[in-house]
Swiss-Prot record:
BP-aspect Gene Ontology terms: DNA-templated transcription initiation
Gene Ontology MF: a single term: DNA-directed RNA polymerase activity
Highest taxon of source: Archaea
Nucleotidyltransferase listed as a keyword: yes
Protein location: Cytoplasm
One Pfam family named in its UniProt record: SHS2_Rpb7-N
Natural source organism: Saccharolobus solfataricus (strain ATCC 35092 / DSM 1617 / JCM 11322 / P2) (Sulfolobus solfataricus)
Annotated domain remarks: Forms 2 domains with an elongated structure; Rpo4 packs into the hinge region between the 2 domains.
Name of the protein: DNA-directed RNA polymerase subunit Rpo7
Summary of subunit composition and partner proteins: Part of the 13-subunit RNA polymerase complex. Forms a stalk with Rpo4 that extends from the main structure.
NCBIfam families for this protein: PRK08563.1 (NF006333), rpoE (TIGR00448)
Underlying gene: rpo7
Length: 180
């Protein structure tokens, strides 16, 4: 789930940046501090926007920089259990498929793709159904549901487990055929 979060912080403006527009300098500092990092309870920070920097700064003894209060917006992504997502198949392996969810990737275990018995063909890099003859391969567009999000080491992307074994989930081509 994407979130727009309003935040406040203190930004250090180094002396070599004095004279430049405060909001631009603060934006660069905030990007270095937060962007592409995982923050507890907030998720993966994708972008920093709408920076408003206080004109008045604070001097700290022994440091030539000024410190300014800033207000800004962050766009973050947090995978949520039960969320329905769509993405492109990035990789097909004998144990399942990896799906690009945008900022992160998720895994659909082979047992969670469909009710059919599935086989992996490593020569063609596909998974196919024994009875249905349905094929899934790299580049296919799929819809899935998040069934678990496992935290890893701090600062690392979480592992996202997906399922496609529910109505209106699966390869988008299969879903449109079912609707007809």
């Amino acid at each position: 789930m994407y979130k727009l979060i309003k935040a406040r912080s203190i930004v250090r403006i180094p002396p070599n940046e004095f004279g430049k527009p405060l909001n631009e300098i603060a934006l660069n500092e905030l990007r270095q501090q937060y962007q592409e990092k995982i923050l507890k309870d907030l998720g993966l920070v994708l972008a920093i926007l709408n920076v408003k920097t206080s004109e008045e700064g604070i001097l700290v003894f022994g440091d030539g920089a000024t410190y300014h209060e800033v207000e800004f917006d962050m766009i973050t992504y947090v995978p949520v259990v039960q969320e329905v997502v769509e993405g492109e198949v990035l990789q097909v392996d004998n144990y399942g498929i990896f799906v690009n969810l945008g900022p992160m990737d998720g895994l659909v275990h082979i047992s969670q793709i469909t009710d059919d018995t599935l086989k992996y063909d490593n020569v063609r890099g596909i998974i196919f159904g024994e009875k249905s003859k349905k094929v899934i391969q790299k580049g296919d567009k799929v819809r899935a549901r998040v069934i678990s999000v496992a935290s890893t080491v701090t600062g690392r992307l979480p592992r996202i487990a997906l399922t496609m074994r529910q109505p209106y989930l699966g390869k988008l081509e299969w879903i449109t055929q079912t609707k007809k």
